């Protein structure tokens, strides 16, 4: 009572997915809250064309993906609220470019890595370009462009909320 999970359960009927999670894409008719056991108890997840899983946090609009058995809430960014409006989840404020790295149909607006001419550059972090062995090329030594950008965004937008963030496996 009084928790986000209690509100989700009070306002949604638990249903069995029409399609098999992990094996099939949800159908247009599938919009539900389902449950499954995880390592920490019962988790709840939204699946399909759900319209009531929006939540405001850190002056941004997020969509609830899952509530883990430990009570942690997994969110994805819906609207970055760069305009700073009072209600970032209002449909009038939906952003067409909220994603941190958005695919435009031909390119991403943020490069994964500005460097590209060596297979060392394929990781989130990378090692030494031109290295003669795999371990040196793929060591976690240097940050990719996307990791640097993501860390900057986190520091500017979420770092002050760190006490409310769960460090858990997605």
Q: What is each residue range found by the language model?
A:
Residues 1-170:
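Long, domain-scale functional regions
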